Amino acid sequence: MREILLLGLALTLTGCMGLPKPDPNQAWVDLNVPADNALHAQQVDAQALDDHRYFEVQPGTHELTVRYQFTVAPDNIGPQATPLSRDCQLNIKYSNFNAGERYQLEAGSLGFTPWAKLYDQQRRLVGRAQPAGCQGA
């Protein structure tokens, strides 16, 4: 049991070590998603990203596009249904990104409907995403 805990800790630390150090001249956006779902940074201002684990943007106004993959539970579909995978894009525009600040983009779903919210460093809600299309995964 102890070996499993140590392995889990090592994997967690390895994953964190892979992220670059945030640039103090830019705003950093962390991605937060429930377990068993996936959230990926796709684009900033319609420009594709190389690294899908976070956003790093210049101060000012930007539109972020994320890809959110989640599973709709059977009780949200109907009797005797099986879980259904969804693959959605969402866009969120925010006009006041500040250099050196860290933001949190959280995603989730209500049944078939995905949502994402942007929070600033003080955990104030500063933006809500708009759906940009979904398909079955």
Model-derived regions, located:
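Sec-dependent bacterial lipoprotein signal peptides
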Residues: M1-G18
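Short loop/turn and low-complexity linker motifs enriched in small/turn-promoting residues
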Residues: C16-A137
